[in-house]
């Protein structure tokens, strides 16, 4: 079985909110070219925008850039968002949220911190690595039946940068 190397598109943009729209337009065009459905394209745009907004809001005190790479396979797209800003502690993040009580109205939920859960819901696989900055890898398969049954949440394991 021959493994095909993915086509890769890379971009670096300032970590400023006005560039999140540029990234959304870029990923929309790429996903459309690959043949994703309208709903999947919208999900991908939201997930990528959330990841970029996290960089804008949390990675840097001032200035800085975010790197994006789009790895295009026959059956999926892997999107990697990186920054060189403040590292992210997943365990501390989980503890800060506390348990979510489903019996309470949504207005009573703690504000903020739901971006990663939204990303995890919209994408098929999510992996995060914290080191000198954050690397967030998100995968969306073209077909639902290609999603690996073992994918069950946000993974804080090592993600190799491609």
UniProtKB/Swiss-Prot annotation:
Annotated signal peptide: none
UniProt KW keywords: ATP-binding, Kinase, Nucleotide-binding, Serine/threonine-protein kinase, Transferase
Cross-referenced CDD domains: HATPase_RsbW-like
A Pfam family this chain is assigned to: HATPase_c_2
SUPFAM superfamilies registered for this protein in UniProt: ATPase domain of HSP90 chaperone/DNA topoisomerase II/histidine kinase
Catalysed reactions, semicolon-separated: L-seryl-[protein] + ATP = O-phospho-L-seryl-[protein] + ADP + H(+); L-threonyl-[protein] + ATP = O-phospho-L-threonyl-[protein] + ADP + H(+)
InterPro entries, A to Z: Anti-sigma-factor_SerPK, HATPase_C_sf, RsbW
GO molecular function: ATP binding; protein serine kinase activity; protein serine/threonine kinase activity; sigma factor antagonist activity
Known EC number: 2.7.11.1
Gene3D superfamilies: Histidine kinase-like ATPase, C-terminal domain
Disulfide bridge map: none
Family (UniProt): Belongs to the anti-sigma-factor family.
Function: Negative regulator of sigma-B activity. Phosphorylates and inactivates its specific antagonist protein, RsbV. Upon phosphorylation of RsbV, RsbW is released and binds to sigma-B, thereby blocking its ability to form an RNA polymerase holoenzyme (E-sigma-B).
Name of the protein this chain belongs to: Serine-protein kinase RsbW
Source organism: Halalkalibacterium halodurans (strain ATCC BAA-125 / DSM 18197 / FERM 7344 / JCM 9153 / C-125) (Bacillus halodurans)
């Amino acid at each position: 079985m021959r493994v095909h190397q993915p086509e890769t598109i890379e971009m670096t943009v300032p970590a400023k909110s006005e560039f999140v729209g540029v990234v959304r337009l870029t990923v929309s065009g790429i996903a459309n070219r690959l043949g994703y459905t309208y709903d999947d394209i919208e999900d991908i745009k939201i997930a990528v925008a959330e990841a970029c907004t996290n960089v804008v809001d949390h990675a840097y005190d001032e200035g800085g850039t975010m790197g994006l790479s789009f790895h295009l396979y026959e059956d999926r797209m892997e999107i990697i968002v990186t920054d060189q800003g403040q590292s992210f502690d997943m365990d501390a993040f989980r503890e800060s949220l506390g348990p979510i009580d489903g019996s309470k109205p949504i207005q009573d939920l703690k504000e903020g911190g739901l971006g990663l859960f939204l990303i995890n819901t919209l994408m098929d696989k999510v992996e995060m690595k914290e080191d000198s900055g954050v690397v967030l890898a998100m995968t969306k398969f073209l077909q639902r039946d290609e999603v690996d049954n073992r994918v069950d949440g946000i993974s804080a394991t090592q993600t190799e940068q491609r």
